[in-house]
Regions:
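A charged helix-plus-loop insertion that forms the helical arch/lid used to bind
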Residues: 82-92
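Short amphipathic alpha-helical segments and helix-helix/interface helices
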Residues: 50-57, 94, 127-132, 149
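PIN/NYN-family metal-dependent endoribonuclease catalytic core
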Residues: 14-15, 24-81
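General small-molecule cofactor/ligand-binding pocket signal
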Residues: 65, 103, 160
Length: 170
């Protein structure tokens, strides 16, 4: 199945922390020359992969959302990087959100399935809740997290692992 044809059926892209982090990291290494972060790149290591991921996100035509919990995970990651690059990383997060037309939604703990939270944590729980909340918009989750990916597949939710986007044939 071609990804571009899949996007036409899915109206909303829900982004996990991993894809956002990878896009920001690649830009930080390639544009800001923060070479100390190169070793953290896992999925987007060259311009072609960055382009494919950016193109995939853009194909949702400004219909992207994430959980406020994802922003907290980004904060914890950036806080652990070298101090001199933190402002640049935050500016890049803002740019990515603006470029994606990102909406950010709060999901309350009591709105999430307790057993899922106990197994996977509140961030993944919030993404699943967003998927359920927006079921009428045919949502798709993009993640780097294999346990979340597997749970989405098992639950019948639409999900892509970032490798399915970055490694696809052009």
């Amino acid at each position: 199945m071609r990804i571009s044809s899949t996007n036409r059926r899915h109206g909303l892209l829900i982004l996990d922390t991993g894809p956002i982090r990878e896009l920001v990291l690649f830009h930080a290494v390639s544009e800001f020359r923060l070479e100390n972060l190169r070793g953290e790149l896992r999925f987007i290591k060259e311009q072609e992969s960055y382009g494919k991921c950016s193109e995939f996100v853009a194909s949702f035509r400004q219909m992207t959302t994430t959980s406020a919990s994802v922003v907290v995970e980004l904060y914890h990651w950036i806080r652990e990087t070298e101090r001199h690059g933190q402002n640049k990383l935050w500016r890049r997060v803002y740019e990515e959100f603006q470029n994606m037309g990102m909406d950010e939604e709060v999901v309350k703990l009591l709105e999430m399935d307790a057993s899922f939270i106990m197994r996977f944590g509140p961030v993944d729980g919030s993404l699943l809740e967003l998927s359920r909340r927006h079921a009428g918009r045919n949502p798709m989750i993009l993640t780097t997290d294999l346990p979340l990916y597997g749970e989405c597949k098992k639950s019948g939710l639409s999900v892509y692992h970032i490798d399915e986007v970055t490694l696809k044939e052009s």
